[in-house]
């Protein structure tokens, strides 16, 4: 199997792996993608689809190349966007035949091989008034699955837009007639549907709208500022990830990943630095590493930092934050942490390698005597006793006592002038 180790976004550079729909299947990330076949062209040429997987979001393995010849389509240049789902131990692959039809294939493994489930389109362009392409599949909390598809009225004419329908348990037929989604925005194609904090998020090209019902109506909120093309979201290891399109060229695109944070008002926030450099690895030369950029979080929640800006990572019991592949550590001599401690005392352990790895240092925190929330913010630091390897996983083990909320804001590594000698 082909493997690629990414240094930054895009995660699979120079290969035309685009229109990413990302899923957490069996505690592993799977990227279901279209494939721009030819660089330096002035139109889309897409001969197949690709499925990539990763256990750390940095090292990616090509699971399979899916060819339209294996389905009802036959040879094609129009292998447009795809999505996938898991139900009852089987995996379902929904694919676009250009902007005209949608098919479905099934496999016993998330990486395939996939077999055409119907031998004909699931949507042949006649069931609704919209253009039936760009499928997005969504699993709700009650175990029901829905398919969203369609292109915008401003492009394809009256009656077009997003449509949604609940799927039967077989995942290859509809349990109801697709209905049009009401959206107070112009919309697009390239839909994705997720649920965060009890709200349904319909997203498209970085834009997103929110509803209390899976069927809508959806109220436009804003843009993630991470991409203007296909994207999708998934939750994994206590973190929210967005798979984004990175435009290396207009018709030869790539895919990247970034973290996503949700404000109290429902806005989705991304970080420009992470949009550029990607997830799962960090540079100790950065001025600060935000706590919410963790790759894995146990017993934590993100909350808005009302005193300053951005987000905090909060816990009220033992918690663990993991920041793997921290680079350029060999010339660093110390560690500095910004945090809040409210209600009592806490201990923050900084370790390498894992939760039980070597201890770099420890910070003892306690609720300050100041009466204003602003002054609950503290900074503390310590010097390393040993020289660090140049690349290492760094883990924060948080131990608040009962009745204490510990919030981590950010941290950075110290490089003293003497280390340059």
What are these regions (language model features)?
Residues 1-421:
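Carbohydrate-active catalytic/glycan-binding domains of CAZyme proteins
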């Amino acid at each position: 199997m082909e493997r690629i180790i990414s240094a930054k976004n895009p995660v699979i550079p120079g290969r035309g792996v685009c229109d990413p729909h990302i899923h957490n299947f069996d505690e592993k990330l799977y990227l279901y993608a279209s494939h721009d076949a030819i660089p330096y062209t002035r139109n889309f040429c897409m001969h197949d689809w690709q499925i990539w997987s990763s256990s750390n979001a940095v090292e990616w393995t090509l699971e399979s190349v899916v060819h339209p010849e294996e389905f009802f389509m036959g040879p094609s240049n129009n292998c447009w966007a795809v999505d996938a789902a898991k139900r009852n131990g089987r995996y379902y692959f929904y694919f676009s035949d250009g902007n005209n039809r949608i098919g479905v294939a099934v496999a016993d493994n998330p990486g395939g091989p996939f077999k055409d489930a119907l031998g004909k389109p699931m949507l042949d362009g006649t069931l609704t008034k919209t253009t039936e392409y760009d499928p997005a599949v969504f699993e709700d909390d009650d175990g029901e699955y829905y398919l969203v598809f369609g292109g915008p009225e401003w492009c394809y004419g009256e009656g077009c837009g997003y449509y949604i329908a609940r799927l039967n348990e077989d995942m290859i037929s509809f349990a109801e007639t697709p209905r049009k989604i009401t959206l107070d925005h112009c919309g697009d194609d390239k839909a994705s549907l997720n649920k965060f904090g009890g709200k349904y998020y319909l997203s498209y090209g970085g834009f997103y709208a929110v509803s209390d019902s899976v069927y809508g109506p959806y109220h436009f909120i804003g843009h993630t500022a991470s991409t203007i093309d296909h994207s999708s979201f998934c939750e994994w290891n206590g973190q929210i990830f967005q798979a984004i399109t990175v435009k290396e060229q207009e018709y030869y695109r790539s895919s990247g990943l970034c973290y996503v944070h949700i404000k109290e008002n429902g806005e989705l926030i991304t970080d420009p630095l992470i949009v550029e450099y990607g997830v799962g690895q960090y540079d100790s030369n950065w001025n600060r590493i935000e706590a919410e950029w963790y790759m894995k979080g146990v017993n934590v929640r993100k909350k808005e930092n009302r005193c300053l800006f951005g987000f905090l990572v909060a816990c009220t019991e033992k918690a663990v934050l993991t920041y793997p592949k921290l680079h350029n550590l060999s010339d660093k001599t110390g560690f500095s942490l910004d945090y809040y401690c409210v209600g009592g005392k806490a201990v923050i352990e900084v370790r390498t390698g894992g939760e039980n790895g070597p201890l770099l240092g420890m910070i003892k925190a306690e609720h300050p005597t100041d009466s204003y929330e602003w002054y609950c913010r503290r900074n503390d630091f310590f010097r390393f006793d040993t020289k660090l390897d140049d690349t290492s996983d760094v883990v924060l083990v948080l131990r608040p006592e009962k009745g204490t909320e510990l919030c981590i804001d950010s941290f950075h590594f110290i490089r003293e002038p003497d280390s340059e000698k």
